[in-house]
């Protein structure tokens, strides 16, 4: 009986199998971003990723042998759920495409304030893709105010086009990440 002298293949730590074609596409896209960042020595960024997509991205980076020092996930604030994958090889100039838009409601006292669904619905009404939008934070200490983390291009579009959320008029202010207040952890 013939026997192989090769040792049994080792399991790859951190492997997460893709379940759908979209997930397989995401993993290939992350590998392509990693190759481009490493090959050209320039920073590359993904769109905003959900928790599952972040796990798949980590698995793809693991499979592509990208060192942990060359990538991180950034959501704009410490408690962020939706985050960008930032591939920043050593020696590159990082220029994160992340920004924050402050939305302030202009309502009469006693009027109902919009909720998270209202904000998300209004942003989707601008025909923005979900990958362009990160977390929407509604701080409890400042009712009528929301902070939307987004890609720079989406943030600029929000500032130009968003006039109301639900039936409530809003004013928009584009903030740098340094200007974002600290939010209490939920």
Describe the function of each predicted region.
Residues 2-186:
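Non-catalytic terminal extensions of ATP-dependent helicases
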